[in-house]
Curated annotation (Swiss-Prot):
Entry-linked InterPro entries: Ribosomal_bL20 (IPR005813), RIBOSOMAL_L20_CS (IPR049946), Ribosomal_protein_bL20_C (IPR035566)
GO BP, one annotated term: ribosomal large subunit assembly
Entry's Gene Ontology molecular function annotations: rRNA binding; structural constituent of ribosome
Protein name: Large ribosomal subunit protein bL20
Gene3D superfamilies: 6.10.160.10, Ribosomal protein L20
A single Gene Ontology CC term: ribosome
CDD domains with a match to the protein in the record: Ribosomal_L20 (cd07026)
Residues annotated as signal peptide: none
Organism annotation: Rhodopseudomonas palustris (strain BisA53)
Length: 119
């Protein structure tokens, strides 16, 4: 069997790593060892932050809802409790969007929640 030299394979592998490391600073973009480590770490950060993004957005929606219901005389937790009691099933993303873009509709929902708490 003929001897196989690994030049072509190694070059292709390195090229793949360098492509993934494009835009990195310093040695991280042009030294294979540093580039490989940087690309691995970038993948870890990407995986972690895809999970974290969901938490971050939920927190943002909650802050927006809280800011919108305070002038109406409620806190966020009281408002959510009122929604649950009134049977309104609207998620936080939609509530946040309504609070920003459709304040009249949001106010109507808030009044319904307030009425459910009073009853």
């Amino acid at each position: 069997m003929a001897r196989v030299k690994r030049g072509v394979t190694a070059h292709a592998k390195h090229k793949k790593v360098y492509k993934a490391a494009k835009g990195f600073r310093g040695r991280r973009k042009n030294t294979i060892r540093a580039a490989k480590a940087a690309v691995d770490k970038a993948g870890q950060y990407a995986f972690r932050d895809r999970k974290r993004k969901k938490r971050t957005f939920r927190a943002l929606w909650i802050q927006r809802i809280n800011a919108a219901v305070r002038p109406l005389g409620m806190t966020y937790s009281v408002f959510i409790n009122g929604l649950a009691k009134s049977g309104v099933i609207v998620d936080r993303k939609v509530l946040s969007d309504l609070a920003i873009h459709e304040p009249v509709a949001f106010q109507a929902i808030a009044e319904k929640a307030k009425a459910a708490l009073a009853a």
